Amino acid sequence: MSKDSPLIALVAGEISGDILGAGLINALKIHYPNARFIGVAGPQMIQAGCQTLFDMEELAVMGLAEVVKHLPRLLKRRKQVIQTMLQQQPDIFIGIDAPDFNLTIEQKLKAKGITTIHYVSPSVWAWRQDRIHKIKRATNLVLAFLPFEKAFYDRFNVACRFIGHTMADAIALKPNRTEACQILNIDENQRYLAILAGSRASEVDFLAEPFLKAALLLKQKYPDLQCLVPLVNQQRIQQFEQIKARVAPSLPVKILKGNARQAMIAADATLLASGTAALEAMLCKSPMVVGYKLKPTSYWLAKRLIKTKYISLPNLLADDMLVPELIQDECNPENLAWYLGNYLADDIDNKKQQNELKQRFTDLHKMIQCDADSKAAQAVIDLLANSDDQ
């Protein structure tokens, strides 16, 4: 490559990957103003200067049934990416998340001498740990958001760099509740519970009912309690409203399209499904209860596959049960309301415990707030420099 104008390939498969890719491209352009970027990009990466082979939306399929339905097209697109990369011979290939799509591409390209990075570790530390061997074959380096992920890769001698989490960079160490309430157009003197029942239809199906019934129980004890319900799109809003009409028609709720972050900052407590939302709640310093339910067969399988003590990212980061995790049968209205009630109570002991919890959240926030875009860019620069020297 020309030292100051590398050809850098990136493939993102969904919106979150597009955001990461754009941040990385912008950070790389500081060091390489003349770099060229090609691959599969969404609107933000395109705006940052990446030429895309096809619309990223073609890869954004979720759930087994949807993947199976679109499999011939996905395989065709993957073959197209591999062929294009072998023709173009980029100086480095960066697969952003989407491991089922990207790892095979990375493996094929690495075998042909192209340097590869996988950006965002798959949850290989939690389940399907045998994937570590494919990751080792496929990548020159993994970029990990969380420190315990790097520790896992180190055990298997897989090159990995901890870069911190982009979400920790985006959220202030001391979130501004007044500003969040203004954005949501709500009274900051009111008591709020944020309810996040998940982004997938199946999650809302399983969790909306126990979450709403828990809120009804809390409303009896705290009549001034208001519920904030951020949902990702119009389909989830309609689905949630139908369930609410059946199980909690009298409960006053403010339904929001998006604005989950502001809802969690404004809320006195958050009730949520496990996943990235739990990490976001921690960064928002929102005391939370994590609830999750699956089909009985899926739960039976998950129990046997998942290898970690905890399921929520705050607890995994702390290696401690910082926040309650109520799974399957334990995820019932009475349990959820009892744990949430501890956060809403006004007595001195509970306030002290809340302050201690928020301090733990702040300490964890600092641990993963590392300017991830710059760290990721530096990892790319270092690998390019190494390949130049060889």
Curated annotation (Swiss-Prot):
Pathway participation: Bacterial outer membrane biogenesis; LPS lipid A biosynthesis
Record-listed E.C. numbers: 2.4.1.182
GO annotation, cellular component aspect: membrane
A GO term, aspect molecular function: lipid-A-disaccharide synthase activity
SUPFAM superfamilies referenced in this protein's UniProt entry, alphabetically: UDP-Glycosyltransferase/glycogen phosphorylase (SSF53756)
Swiss-Prot/TrEMBL GO biological process terms: lipid A biosynthetic process
InterPro entries xref list: Glyco_trans_19 (IPR003835)
Keyword Lipid biosynthesis: yes
Keywords: Glycosyltransferase, Lipid A biosynthesis, Lipid biosynthesis, Lipid metabolism, Transferase
Main enzyme class: transferase
Catalytic activity: a lipid X + a UDP-2-N,3-O-bis[(3R)-3-hydroxyacyl]-alpha-D-glucosamine = a lipid A disaccharide + UDP + H(+)
Similarity field: Belongs to the LpxB family.
Role description: Condensation of UDP-2,3-diacylglucosamine and 2,3-diacylglucosamine-1-phosphate to form lipid A disaccharide, a precursor of lipid A, a phosphorylated glycolipid that anchors the lipopolysaccharide to the outer membrane of the cell.
Record PANTHER family: LIPID-A-DISACCHARIDE SYNTHASE, LIPID-A-DISACCHARIDE SYNTHASE, MITOCHONDRIAL-RELATED
Protein name per Swiss-Prot or TrEMBL: Lipid-A-disaccharide synthase
Species of provenance: Haemophilus ducreyi (strain 35000HP / ATCC 700724)
